Structures are given as C-alpha cells and as structure tokens.
Amino acid sequence: MKTAEIRRRYLAHFEANGHAVVPSAPLPAISDPNLLFVAAGMMQFVPYFLGQQTAPYKRAVSVQKCLRTPDIDEVGKTSRHGTFFQMNGNFSFGDYFKDEAIPLAWDLATKSVDAGGFGLDPERIWPTVYLDDDEAYEVWRSVGVPADRIVRRGKADNFWSMGIPGPCGPCSELFYDRGPEYGLEGGPAVDEDRYLEFWNLVFMQFERGPGTGKEDYPILGDLPAKNIDTGMGLERMASILQGVDNLYEIDEVRPILDRAAELTGKRYGAHSGHVASESHPDDVRLRVVADHVRTALMLIGDGVTPSNEGRGYVLRRIMRRAIRSIRLLGWQERAMPELLPVARDCMSPSYPELAADFGRIADYAYAEEDAFLSTLRAGTTILDTAIAESRTAGRRAISGAQAFQLHDTYGFPIDLTLEIANEQGMQVDAEGFRRLMADQRARAKADAQARKTGHVDLSAYRTVLDEGGPVTFTGYHEVSRESTVRAVLGEAGPRAAAVEGDTVELVLDTTPFYAEGGGQQPDLGVITVGGGQVEVLDVQQPVPGLIVHRARVLRGEVRAGETGFAEIDASRRRAISRSHTATHLVHQTMRNFLGESATQAGSLNAPGRLRFDFNTPTGVAPSVLRDVEQQVNEALLADLEVRAFVTSLAEARRIGAMALFGEKYGEQVRVVEVGDYARELCGGTHVARSGQLGLVKILSESSIGSGVRRVEALVGIDAFNFLAREHLLVARLAELYRVPSDQVADRVEQTVSQLRDAEKELEKLRAQLVLGGAAALAAQATEVRGVAYVGTEAPEGASGNDVRTLAQEIRGRIDPARPAVVAVAARSNGKASLVVAVNQAARSRGLSAADLVKAAFAGRGGGSPELAQGGGLPAAEAPGLLRTVENAIAGA
C-alpha cells in the first residue's frame, strides 16, 4: 500500500467517525518561540489541551509534517532515526476517551484492505498499557486481544507528560510482530526490533505537579476534561504495510536512494541484513542522502531558506550532509538537480503544492549546493592543513580557534569539521569552539536585553487572560475609546497602581491600540484615567488574545479597575497604514515580475517608510525595479478600493489570497484586498483607497542573506519630500554645469572620467619623479665594508608603493655581482617609514633586509631577507634610520 494511500485511509476513517480534518501546520514552529520546528502531531493543538484556547471542534484528525534533528548523526545507521517524518494523529478535546479511542484504532488497523482498513493480522498486534491502567486493559480485552498479548509496562514506557506541570496520563502503544527473522519472540519488552511500535494512544486524564526526571513527579488529581492524543508514524506504518525493513525503503524515500545508488555506482543492500545498524558505510551514506534530500525539499517547501542561523542553519546542515555523503560515495558533480526532482515526485501525491512550487524550491537548493561545493573545496584544504600541522606538532586535536576560524571566516560548519576530523582519527577542541562562538554571540546580542519588552515569565500574562478573557481590539474602525484598566503589571507582576514616573504595562478591556505584529509597528498615544495620564511607549501581544500597553505615567496615578480614555496618535497610524498597504502592493508587483517564488520573508511597516524582504535566489535588475515602482504607482493612481473581511481559511485560499510561508492560521482569517490587484491574509491596518498612499518611491534593493533580498521604500509625504530634495540637487548641478537637467548625468560621468584620467596621469608623473633619480642614486653608492650602500629619502608625497618600487629600482641598477644594500626613508602624516632592499650578493655575505629593518626599529618591522619595511617613528627620525642601517652594515 502506497504511503499516500495510508494517509488517505487514516484521514477518511476518522472523518467518517466525526473528526474534523485539520491541515498540517507548517514545519517551522511559528507559535512557539522556544522551538525551531514542529516535532509532534499534537503541537498545533497544545493551546486546546492546556485550556488556553477553546477548540473549534470536539474531535480532530491530521497528518502533521514533523522534523527532529537531535539524533541527526544516527540517521542512516539505525532503522529508527530520520529527520523528516509524518505523524498521523486523532484527537479528542473532552469528547471521547479510552472506550472509543481504542476501538477506533483497532478497527482501522485490522479492518480488511477492501473495507478501507490497513488489513493487519490481529494475531500479530501486541498492545501495551500502563501498569495499573485496568480500564485500558479491559477495553483491549473487549475488542478481542487475548490477555497474554497485552503487556503492562511502567511509567518510563507507558505514561506521558509534557515534562512540566500540566496534563499527563497513561498511554497504550500498539506493536506489530514482524516475525522471527527480526529477533526474539516474547513481545515488545523482549525485542523492539522484532516488535515494531506503530501507534501510541495517550489518555490525558491527570494533572501532574513539578518534579525532575521522567518518573519523579506527583499526580495532583483528575483533569476537568479528559483528552485523547494519538500518534501513528506514517513512515513506520508504511514500512509494515510495504514489507520493507526500515523507513528508508518505503515508496516515498526508496526512489531517491536508488537514484543516488545509480549515480554513484553502488548497489544498495549488498552488505546489509535486517538490522540497519549493521550496514556497510556505503548503505549508511545512501540512506543519509535519501533522508536528507527529502527533508530539504519539505523544509524549503515550507518557506525555510538556507542561512547561518536558526531554522536556516538546520536546513543548511542537512543539505550539506547529503551533498558530502554522496561525494564520499564517488559522485563529484552537482547532486541536487539529480535527486530533488525524484524527491518531488515521491512527495507530491500527498503534497501537490511541492510540484507547483518546485521552481522556487529548486532555485534555493541548487544555489545552496553550488555555494557549499565552493566552501567545501576551500575549507577542506584549510582543514587538511590544520590536521597535518597538528600531527606534525604531536597533537591529537584541532584547536577550537582553528575550528572557529573555519566556521567564521570560511563558512565551514563545525559539524563537518568534527566529521572529517573523526574520519582522519583526529579530535576537535569542541569546548574551545563553543566558547569562542558564545563570545561572538554575546557581543552580537549585547543590547538584546535593552530592547526586550515584557516579562520573562509569561504566567503573569496568562493569569490576566484567564481572569478576564481576550482583549477586544477596536482599532480597525476607531482611534479612541473609553476603556477600563483590567490590570497594571510591573517587573514583579500585578500591582494595584502606578504613580508619576513609573513605567508599567497596562491591560485594558478594549483598546484601539494596535499591537506590533505582521511587520507593522505598534500604535503610540496616551491613556487618561481619572486624574492620571500615561504615555504609551509600546504595544505587544505576549500571549494570543492579550494586548499589553507599555506606558510611562506622566502625571497622577493609574489604578486597576478605573475607567479612562485611550487615544492613539492618529497621524502616526495613518502613516503606518499607508506603508502597510504599500507593502502589499510591492509584494504583489514583485511576484508579477519575478514569479510566485518571490514570497515575503519579512517586512517593516513604519510611518512613511517600508522594508520588504522577499525570497529570490538572484538580485533584481535596476530596470525591473523601476518597472515595479511604476506599476505600484499606477495602482495608486487607479485609486482602488481597499477592503478587509473575515472568511474561512479554505475560502481565502480558494479566492487566491496570499498566505505567508511559515505562518500558522486559524480556521477564520482576515483578508485584505486592494481592488483586484492584491489579495493577502493580513491582520494589520490599511487605508481605505490606494490613492491615499500618494506616492511610493523605492530607494534600494540589496541582499540580506542567502536567497533573501530587501527592498526599502518611502511612502506618501516622505516619498514626496525625498523627490523634492533630489530635484533641488539635480537643479543645482544643472546650474553649475550650465546644462539642462536631463544632461546632468552625462556631464557628471564625463567629470568623473576626466578626474580618473587626471589621477592616472598624476600617478604616472609622480612615479617618474620618484624613479627618475634611481640611476643617479645607484651611481652615488658608498662603500661600507665592501658593500655598496645607498641611503636616501623619497621625494615628498611618495606613496608606500612608490618607496618600495624606488628601493628595488635602485638595487636593480647596481652591478648584481657587487654586494648592495639600499635604504629608502619616507615621511608621511608626521611619521617616518623605511624600506630596505638587499641583493643576492649581499645575502651571501650574511646581510638580511629584515634584520636591518629590525635594527632600525628596535626589533619591530619585518619582511623577507631581500625586501623589508618598518614604520611608526616620528618623521624627524628619518635621517637617523638611514644612519642606523649604515652602522648595522659596518658592524656586520
């Protein structure tokens, strides 16, 4: 059975049993700042399980895209480890419990293929239950599982919690007996290679207290509502139903592996048994390639692009491991163009958007491979040198400083340094590397604390939210309103009041203040309460539904429970709204010219200006940028109506509303339309008509990272003022040149060209002046102990290069058979410098230019025995430097 069919049957089974089919959340864990990626099927439902939000459905089913990388080094070595995987899951939020969850799972697993099930042999399924979970045990008995195949296990195996105080409960796992060829009989407790877990049913029924470790925590009591969270690894089930040994051999992965084997001339499985950990290195590398290429496809498909930070670095590391693995197998050409299309064909039956978006995905993948191959060539050479030097010095490890230099200067990742060093029997001072990295991060983030808004502990916010519910935002339609202060928060948490001079956080019951989000800067303004007034400095939403105003008390006091008047800076809001609407127009226009791969990667909507970051593998030509600007302003002239409305996510997608990569949307979304020109999911504020923007002027386009470009623009009166200043500047230049303004650029180019020619001529004349006396100076050489010595000062204004050239020119005009030393001193910016040139005949007498310079500068300076230089002494010391060299020759 194909993996896509397993997925379809799973969703269909639970949809037929009253479950809402919920799309997978994107791989980036947008809703949790502490996580990079979604790693479990239940993650998008956590707010429902914790009671932070009310679920819009009682029961749900999904197939969640997941990524786990802590064990990335084990990928390919065992049958259990992979980076990307899919988790089938069915969930109940206070609806059904064990008595329905277990039969639902059993029915799908054992129902015949013809009837829509998976057709597993009931005699080969072994359920496990928690030690004292008699309830689950009895349900398993009721569906027909004999007692000797129901295994009771302890807390470490069959009791689930999130690792923190909160929901917890026993779980029941389903294992499938793959047969005696895979190991010992006796059930999951005896051999988990033979008995493969394929489904875990978690029964959330208790609340746990604080504790350490996996088992050391108290059970505080029952939850008000009991929940179900199940997870079936899609790849695990596919390996069972397709009769293959491991997840690398299922239909969504094996074609990639086979193509890699074909390219490298390797025969997969020639050295393997059933246990993947016993495989030959060639097989391990082929599995790494297959796993990582598929993962790269899915990550880029979900909007992640290669970089040196966060999610982008994980993608970069995965891609580079795949590329290096296939090179170690013997393939030295570009691999991604050969493998990525195969991965697309494997995954697009379940994710058709991968085929539609493949042009963009391929652009990033191929560009990253090209960049890495260049890095690999340079970095490997440097690393090989470092390894050789360490061995010569008798060291068994590469220093942390060398590893850091490879990473920081050459972009050579530390994991690759560790891997290559290990292959050559060397270690790396990883602790020293981490220390240097920590120092660098500390410097880069020195001001992070100063910029931080809000409490480290979010519990204060959650308490306010739980007690009063979500804050109502009214700012779409009004700029001021009467509001009640629900809470006053200080650094230590809630407080009764704040007095003049205090900076606190205020929570109102309703507010017209927009909280920073979606690239839009927050509203500023004032809140007047009783006899007090506060200035709003910042507005944030630290937890969903709670708008928090960071404010300074200007006079009087502010108390929780008082009613007052909240008023935003309306002029600032209008300017920000103009910028936000302009960003939508720039986004759509970029896609018009560059294609749908030009997706938004970030934005800033500030008063009078915008910054728009977008994904594209190459820069934007100036001519295209001009066309984009013109088309945006034509949309302004059309005075299009700007309309915002709320609809279902499915309907928004149907009408073509753009959604941002990586964003997690609810069932209901807000759509902003600018006529028929642009349509985008957005929660920000906008103008009523496009004509209200006035003018958009693009200032610049630049790179801010691999595959990410940035456009900056001015909007409205700021754009007009900029153009007015530019006009005055051009008019002034036209006046100076006495030409029409449209000829100014040509005249400036002509002036610059003339200036460059003059500089070249000046340089030529200066060189002639400096070198013109070289022959005469050589003829005036004096004898110092059988050595021809020329000591002279360079003409005023001579450059450092001129001085070196003069010294060598004089040396070249002295008979090579005659030992000669030339010393040329120079004065520049109040300092004296010296260049010494020594010919080969003088070298044979034991004279060294480097030694003579060090004699003149008390050990400082340097160079080769033939040519050396030094500097830094006061200009008046120039004659003395020449005498010192002469004396050094005399004493040699």
UniProtKB/Swiss-Prot annotation:
Q: Which PROSITE patterns match?
A: AA_TRNA_LIGASE_II_ALA (PS50860)
Identify the residues that bind Zn(2+).
580, 584, 682, 686
Single Gene Ontology MF annotation: tRNA binding
Query: What top-tier enzyme class does this entry carry?
Result: ligase
Q: Which Pfam families match?
A: tRNA-synt_2c (PF01411), tRNA_SAD (PF07973)
- Under Enzyme Commission nomenclature, its number is 6.1.1.7
Keywords from the named record: Aminoacyl-tRNA synthetase, ATP-binding, Cytoplasm, Ligase, Metal-binding, Nucleotide-binding, Protein biosynthesis, RNA-binding, tRNA-binding, Zinc
Q: Which InterPro entries match?
A: aa-tRNA-synth_II/BPL/LPL, Ala-tRNA-lgiase_IIc, Ala-tRNA-ligase_IIc_anticod-bd, Ala-tRNA-synth_IIc_core, Ala-tRNA-synth_IIc_N, Ala-tRNA_ligase, Ala_tRNA_ligase_euk/bac, Thr/Ala-tRNA-synth_IIc_edit
Q: How is the cofactor bound?
A: Binds 1 zinc ion per subunit.
Name the GO cellular-component terms: cytosol
Where does it reside?
Cytoplasm
Catalytic activity annotation: tRNA(Ala) + L-alanine + ATP = L-alanyl-tRNA(Ala) + AMP + diphosphate
Q: Which GO terms describe its biological process?
A: alanyl-tRNA aminoacylation
Broad class of where this protein is predominantly found: cytoplasm
Q: Which domain of life is it from?
A: Bacteria
State its cofactor: Zn(2+)
Report whether Cytoplasm shows up as a keyword of the record.
yes
Q: What is known of its domains?
A: Consists of three domains; the N-terminal catalytic domain, the editing domain and the C-terminal C-Ala domain. The editing domain removes incorrectly charged amino acids, while the C-Ala domain, along with tRNA(Ala), serves as a bridge to cooperatively bring together the editing and aminoacylation centers thus stimulating deacylation of misacylated tRNAs.
Q: Which PANTHER family match?
A: ALANINE--TRNA LIGASE, CYTOPLASMIC, ALANYL-TRNA SYNTHETASE
Annotated family:
Belongs to the class-II aminoacyl-tRNA synthetase family.
What is its biological role?
A: Catalyzes the attachment of alanine to tRNA(Ala) in a two-step reaction: alanine is first activated by ATP to form Ala-AMP and then transferred to the acceptor end of tRNA(Ala). Also edits incorrectly charged Ser-tRNA(Ala) and Gly-tRNA(Ala) via its editing domain.
Q: What is this protein called?
A: Alanine--tRNA ligase
Organism, scientific name: Salinispora arenicola (strain CNS-205)
